[in-house]
Amino acid sequence: MYRRQELLEKLKEAAASVLPISLIVLAICFVLVPVDTGLMLSFVLATALLILGMGLFTLGAEMSMSKIGNYIGAKLTKSRKLWLILVVSFLLGVAITVAEPDLQVLAANVPEIDKTVLILTVSVGVGIFLMLCMVRILFGISLRLLLIVFYALVFLAAFLSDQGILAVAFDSGGVTTGPMTVPFIMALGVGVASIRSDENAKADSFGLVGLCSIGPIASVLLLGAIYKTQPAQTQSEAAAAITNTVALGRDYLHAFPEYMKEVTLALLPIVVFFLVFQFVSLRLRKLPFLRVMVGILYTYAGLVLFLTGVNVGFSPVGYALGAALTEGWKIWLLIPLAMLMGWFIINAEPAVHILNKQVEDLSAGAISARAMGVSLSIAVSAAGGLAMLRVITGVSIMVFLVLGYFLALALSFFVPRTFTAIAFDSGGVASGPLTATFMLPFAMGACEALGGNVMTDAFGLVALVAMMPLITVQVMGAIYVVKSRRAEKEPALPDFGESEIIELWEAC
């Protein structure tokens, strides 16, 4: 009964994320852009699969991945062996990232890099930086220092790298901090932080996700220097015309076995690692062990449904709409529509509401959750608009990234460090599943129709969306600092103590 209630809650959250975009798409298709009936029917079916898949997946990830992170983190703290903590962190970082659904979707849409090569490259980057995160927690190294040093190195590498790979590299950093990796990394960090007994130990467990997102950027930039690109068709382009319901059913039935195999291979490393750890060291009791295994089954089923819906019916419609809206006067709708989608995507993301509440609590109510929510919505909406502006004009992604990250890192000197840690952790919150599954194909369709370069002009959308919370959260932190200083300067009202109150008629 309890699990059923939890599943219903997750399905409601998934529906709140998916339905706003679906309704916008339906409105566009009925009013502005004629879409083939078969493709639209496929989109409706894909929407249902996305809702069910996301609901099952998020419940399963909470039951399994978060628990595995907690259990292994707690066990590692007891060993107090640095080499063991680092080796396990690397292996877990790689294994958990391979199964990240947002990364699977992004990799399927990159036309010039083999999907498996890109996923493994990104996963190794996360694994290496997860090791660095453990070192930072154990030795209390400044998060700001690490962010400045590594982003400086990343941007130096970016200016020296092949310009065609830049946008994909920064997008990779945005999609890896998704619903699979974030709860796991956070749980592992909290467990390892418990080794320390000083007052800053808990605060240092924040910032792990933000630091880990640098790893994929660096590793993909390195990949661009050594890997020979291979032009290929993206999955968003690969939608064949659907002539009848039998053809529609055939498309989905043929896709299910393919994604069942993909998800099996993606989840296998983390499952094998957990089982080995369970029988060698962890030795959970029967009930907790079974709960984790049931959670893994939920995760598996959810991922299969999610990826099938995305690749067969959801992303292809985004691609088709983007292409159709470049015709004539409709091109001027690309930017406002992208901004509208950005507004609804961030508003519908459940993790965003948790972030808003965190900021409200940190600021002791000086920054309300509502004010934080509106600020994030405006920021992500602006990111969507800037991404489409790039598609139309071909402006380099580096113009926005250099300015944005410079501002984000500069703000870290003026706000409490916990605000900085939460800000860099929250980048993946904003770039939720719908950014990679719909908005990116939408940008790709528009870019191809305009004759642009998809690798340089369409990719980068996820990176812009992920960058905005870094600035927004810290701006709110700066407002909190200003308000706090003003409150300290205001003179307190003199306390005259309790005195006798004289009524007017008594004085007469």
Predicted feature descriptions by range:
Residues 27-41, 61-70, 95-110, 129-141, ...:
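Transmembrane helix-loop junctions in multi-pass membrane proteins
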Residues 2-4, 133-149, 164, 168, ...:
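Juxtamembrane and boundary regions of transmembrane helices in multi-pass small-molecule transporters
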Residues 1-14, 18, 69-83, 197-201, ...:
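Intrinsically disordered, low-complexity non-transmembrane regions of multi-pass membrane transporters
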Residues 74, 82-153, 331-412:
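Helix-loop-helix junctions within the multi-pass membrane cores of secondary transporters/permeases
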Residues 11-17, 41-47, 75-83, 143-148, ...:
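Alpha-helical transmembrane segments and their helix-start/interface "positive-inside/aromatic belt" motifs
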Residues 8-14, 35-45, 77, 110-119, ...:
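Interfacial loop-to-helix junctions that mark the boundaries of transmembrane helices
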